[in-house]
Design a protein with these regions (language model features):
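C-terminal alpha-helical cap/extension of soluble enzyme domains
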Residues: 207-233
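Small-aliphatic-rich amphipathic alpha-helix that forms the alpha element of a beta-alpha
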Residues: 14, 33-39, 80, 103-149, ...
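Glycine-rich phosphate/pyrophosphate-binding beta-alpha loops
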Residues: 42-43
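Glycine/small-residue-rich phosphate/adenosyl-binding loop
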Residues: 46-116
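A contiguous pocket-lining binding segment that forms or flanks enzyme active sites
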Residues: 132, 136-194
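Generic N-terminal amphipathic, Lys/Arg-enriched alpha-helix
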Residues: 6-23
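A conserved mid-domain beta-alpha-beta active-site/ligand-binding segment of alpha/beta enzyme cores
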Residues: 192-203
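Conserved small/polar residues in nucleotide/adenosyl-binding loops
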Residues: 235-242
Length: 246
């Protein structure tokens, strides 16, 4: 493979950072990160998201608790919540005298996608400054609590939360978790269901020296069947129902 250019190298090097130096992010860097997020592609160039810049220390503490009791969230110098926003265009249509339909599941999916793409733009921009980041999936758990904390109206859903900060040396030195081999990620011209042997080959590296079945069962219980996973799945269903029924 040819030598990677700086952008590619940054993408390959990027890993989640959860421990930060006690150093603020300069205002001009923060602004650049936010502006980069807004340059992300979006469905129909609608930018179906709203970014919440969390600066209130008390609110950071509350989010750290509501997002599975993770204190490092409150210590991060920059905390952003990317909301899937189906409200502002709906309100604009009403303002213009239109008779818009009620936002539905498809609108939510587009808005969540827009929010996630914008969030990743912010991550890449931060990496260019040497600023680390971590996605907080727990923002979708306890949705009623999060919506109350963030004063979210109908048709607005907390899709993505990101925390940013200057990584400590220990975080810089930490080995990035391995990714699956490309032949298991890329399918040509259509989806191909993998057989048991391929699945074991795909995820076997994660098991290390443990028997695959033993590792996979433990991982399933800890992740897929966990209370958090069930809560997030329930939250997604409720978000769809809320948009469909309001």
């Amino acid at each position: 493979m040819t030598e990677r250019n700086p952008i590619l190298q940054s993408l390959f090097d990027r890993k989640s950072v959860r421990v930060y130096e006690e150093k603020p992010i300069p205002a001009e860097m923060k602004q650049a990160i936010l502006e980069a997020a807004a340059q992300a592609p979006s469905a129909g160039c609608q930018q179906l998201y709203t970014i919440l810049d969390i600066t209130d220390p008390a609110l950071k503490e509350a989010l750290a608790e509501s997002c599975d009791h993770q204190p490092f969230i409150a210590k991060a110098p920059l905390v952003l919540v990317f909301c899937a926003d189906c409200k502002k265009w709906y309100d604009a249509y009403l303002e213009a005298g239109c008779t818009p339909r009620t936002p539905g599941v498809g609108d939510l999916m587009l808005a969540v996608t827009d929010a996630a793409i914008a969030a990743q733009n912010a991550v890449v921009a931060a990496e260019s400054f040497g600023i680390g980041s971590c996605y907080i999936g727990d923002i979708m758990e306890n949705c009623d609590t999060q919506r109350s904390l963030l004063h979210l109206p109908d048709y607005v859903f907390p899709a993505v939360m990101l925390v940013f900060g200057w990584p400590t040396q220990q975080q810089k030195d930490r080995v990035k978790p391995q990714r699956c081999a490309m032949e298991h990620i890329v399918h040509e011209n259509g989806y191909r269901t993998m057989d048991g042997a391929e699945l074991r080959d795909t995820f076997g590296y994660k098991a290390g020296n443990a028997p695959f079945d033993q590792w996979c069962t433990a991982f399933c219980n800890r992740k897929y069947n966990s209370d958090f996973s069930k809560a997030v799945s329930y939250t997604h269903l409720r978000a769809h129902e809320t948009l469909a029924n309001l």
